[in-house]
Amino acid sequence: MTEVVMFRGSMVAMVTPMKAQDGIRDAVDEKALKQLVEYHVEQGSDAIVAVGTTGESATLDYEEHRDVIRATVEAAAGRIPVIGGTGANSTWEAIELTRSAMEAGCDAALLVVPYYNKPTQEGLVQHFSAIAEAVPIPQILYNVPGRTGCDMLPETVERLADLPNVVGLKEAQGTVERAEEVIRRCGDRLDVFAGDDFNALGMMRVGGKGVISVSANVVPRQMHDLCAAALAGDMQTAEAINERLTPLHQAMFCEPNPVPVKWAVEELGMAGSGMRLPMTRLTEAGQARVRQAMQDAGLL
């Protein structure tokens, strides 16, 4: 692991490149993955999240999770922090994935709220407490109720903030007000990161420490600069960058993530857009919208 403990700025939720085959069991393209890591090191991303939602964690098996995280850590070679996506809707599985990420050399783990089985708030406390107690690695919790069907409330986050290994929250509930309440309750016990590019600046205005970014897959330098300016209090510069990138942020979700961003990465010639079913290639209408947003951002 690197010596970086505190996470700040633009942390790219990196795509997982795949070799287009039958769309059912397309192989991970490890060569392209390592090239992407190099790109993010060169372009100034502040950290890499491997095998998160954008990295198609839902369609990778356990061994593939481990292999993608290992390859990312190897390519990073201590030059940039690596955060491994290790969440699961089984506490035991999440512990095993998190332990594997720690052993691979990750600097932290990103743990999504358990999905589909819809635990109670007490269930969430016990779930994340068990992981924190079992694996001594910094852990960032991830609340994204639009995908999981379960919203981790601010009072629950407040209870978890005292756990020694819980260092942050990726908040993707969708409103700045939610992040502001978590920050008010938790203070400096826990850092809050935006889970959506479109409200990253708003969250940093109220005390957020950065963003786990989809757009940074294609505009890593710009997202780094936006966060650096905001965290330094230079809101004029941050607002100018944000205004220029807003159409791109919106286009990245014109169809379910990571469909648009994988197509955008392919358009830039960095990796193919192959992905596993049930995710399908970006539609022609989506391609037109993303292409226009990329042109507006000066990428094409």
From Swiss-Prot:
The active site is at residues 142, 170. Its main location: cytoplasm. Pyruvate binds at residues 54, 212. Pathway: Amino-acid biosynthesis; L-lysine biosynthesis via DAP pathway; (S)-tetrahydrodipicolinate from L-aspartate: step 3/4. Homotetramer; dimer of dimers. Catalyzes the condensation of (S)-aspartate-beta-semialdehyde [(S)-ASA] and pyruvate to 4-hydroxy-tetrahydrodipicolinate (HTPA). This is 4-hydroxy-tetrahydrodipicolinate synthase. It comes from Halorhodospira halophila (strain DSM 244 / SL1) (Ectothiorhodospira halophila (strain DSM 244 / SL1)).
